[in-house]
Amino acid sequence: MSEIISFNTEELVKAPATPAQSIPTFKLVSEEHPILKKIMPEFDFQNPPVNPNEFASSLVETCKLNKGYGLSANQCNFEYRVFVMGAGDDYVAHFNPKVVSSSSESHMVEGCLSFPLLGLSITRPAIVDVEYQDFNGEKKTATYSGISARCFLHELDHMNGIVYTSRAKPLALQQGMKKRHKLMKSLRIK
């Protein structure tokens, strides 16, 4: 089974909207930043480095501001094992996430806020059973399928120091980078 996502590249380069509330947002790191290749340590709820609820809220606002579906703490230069994913007003914070089981695989084009305008076909499981902690430290389980499974796995890769470009086949990566370069040139983006 093959799924395809398309995205409006003109929308992606528009200036982000202003957050609705006074929740602080974070700056995204660039694709070359070394934090993207580091394994993130577990978030310690016994001795939290930050307020988990406030931190998750800021991740959500940053994700919305940048028109994303998912955002990990390390994409904002924080070494915490947490990410958020969702759309509209429905986002879920995943602290210390892990996959319990997964299904057969599917192909889909993915993008990443840390790699603007780069769409790559990536193979991932279509369905995943997962465990994580919410912002109160309570253990949760969920089953994600389709784009939600893909988003969870993409963000979990960030937690494990894996960027999606390393999951692409070499020729697909080369073609994607070439297409991205042409698009950035046509949009006059450096």
Residue locations for each model-derived region?
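Positively charged
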Residues: M1-K190
